Amino acid sequence: EIRLSLVGSEMCIRDRTYTSDEKLFADYLKYGGFPQRFFLPDEHSIATYLDDLYEAIVVRDVMLRHGIREQTALRNVLAFLLDNIGNPFSARNISGRMVSEGMKISTATVLNYVDYFKEAFILLNASRYDIKGKALLSSTEKYYAVDLGLRNVIKKSEKLDSNKLYENIVYLEMRSRGYEVQVGKLDDTEIDFICYRGNEKLYIQVAYLITPADEEREFGNLERLNDNYPKYVISSDLVDLSRNGIIHRNIIDFLLNP
């Protein structure tokens, strides 16, 4: 690694070449991690495979199993959820959005659809935990895609929110490492993830890139926590921004080196 002195403070820049790793990471962001797709010869074949997988899951695992006739409504609810990964969930808001688009669907039906998507392993949820109140909150949980490739096939919006994609990746990675993952509420701020595994507990904030304004928010929220559990900020930045005992990790480093 290389150390630089900037305005009286020392910063660490990781000295490494990530050409191949960055290409693989970009590929994963776009096409996800279903094993079969790695054996396909080109991007067109991968896209076709993911389309076919989506159709099989929606038609066989959801529509036929639960006797759903309103195919358009089902698909639109799923697309809306995947356009809004990492955002607080409200069935009432989704129902209102669908109604405004000329599609009659009740809040209860939205909730049923969400249960079906979880059952089919299209979506995973993270409950919200009030850190000061020490209680799980019964509403506004968050949902994440079980695979980003499948998510990118289904979503409607062309806007790419890298912050939310990174958040989704970190959520999946911590689940794969055996952690229970919750979203933390701290007064009017949020901790992206509280992770538990046995007696272990740690906190994580996730960002795509950390601007000076972002740095205060991402690190500041963690600095407000009055305990000694490990705290991490994960982003794509190559500059090590660790401060006050809070560890900054580059996202590729984080994925390659648990």
PLM features per residue range, with description:
Residues 1-13:
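Single conserved hydrophobic/aromatic residue that forms the stacking wall/gate
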Residues 3, 17-19, 26-27, 134-135, ...:
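Short secondary-structure boundary/capping segments
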Residues 12, 129, 149, 194, ...:
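Anionic group-transfer/hydrolysis microenvironments
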Residues 15-55:
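Amphipathic alpha-helical "lid/sensor" segments that cap RecA-like P-loop NTPase cores
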Residues 25, 171, 219-223:
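Short amphipathic alpha-helical segments and helix-helix/interface helices
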Residues 38-39, 43-201:
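Accessory nucleic acid-recognition modules appended to NTPase machines
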Residues 184, 208-252:
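Catalytic cores of nucleic-acid endonucleases
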Residues 204:
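Conserved beta3 VAIK motif of the Hanks protein kinase fold
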